[in-house]
Amino acid sequence: MRLERGGAALALVLASAPARARVETRVVEYQEGGAVLEGYLARDTAGPARKPGVLIVHDWSGVGPYVKGRAEQLAAMGYVAFAADIYGKGVRPKTAKEASAAASIYRSDRKLMRARVAAALAELRRQPDVLGNEIAAIGYCFGGTAVLELARSGADVAGVVSFHGGLDSPTPADGKNIRARVLVLHGADDPFVPEAQVKALEDELRGGGVDWQLVEYGGAVHSFTIPDAGSDNSKGAAYNAAADRRSWKAMVDFFAELFPAAR
């Protein structure tokens, strides 16, 4: 998989932001287990005094232009958006090899992954303009896996959205802990997520009595929302404009169900 650099991605993301929003951003330091983490907060200063919050978890490349752009896009839509830092301050992979190594630490230690996402959720909930009972979490690739783990931990969030995330779980019985609504947006031709993994997730969610949706996009592979992934499906990860547009709309509609007062 290609490492996300963010140039084309950021331009595309920001082009769709509402023009009248006044988005304010800042870097936020917080901690988990003695590690210093550095997230990115975005809010619309022209909006209501209190708003729903959206936690965003990055792909394997860490906090960078792409996830920051998504945070700004969500802020312009009226949410307080916080891009979590799972890796830690200063850990910003520069190559695919470095990104794979960083992500592997958390993929192989789901307890640590959950702790890092929970710390970011707590930081978002501390923001004075966030409606504490109206929070959703979204994630891309590695981050999609992370928000599903957040749900499996029993976290008090309204919903989670996984964009082309890994769907495997070493503890499928934890599906019974899920209180959030779940939306999984998946590339039907993603070679990194076998059909058996999709089926196992469906069984897990059914077994837990979860309110869930799984949408598969034909012709889409891994990283279908990330323009910098390129256009060659044969590499297993590639941008798909239609799937990007449709999956974002699916998320927007999902949020409208979660937060009807914010419409």
For the regions a language model picked out, list residue spans one by one:
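Serine-hydrolase catalytic machinery in alpha/beta-hydrolase-like enzymes
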Residues: 27-129, 226-238
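Alpha/beta-hydrolase fold nucleophile elbow
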Residues: 129-140
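Gly/Ala-rich beta-loop-alpha elbow adjacent to hydrolase catalytic centers
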Residues: 139-143, 147
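Short beta-strand/loop motif that positions the catalytic acidic residue
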Residues: 184-186
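A conserved short beta-strand
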Residues: 156-166
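C-terminal catalytic histidine-bearing segment of alpha/beta-hydrolase fold enzymes
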Residues: 40, 206, 211-263
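Acidic catalytic loop of the alpha/beta-hydrolase fold
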Residues: 189-193
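Short alpha-helix in the alpha/beta-hydrolase fold that links the catalytic acid
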Residues: 70, 194-204
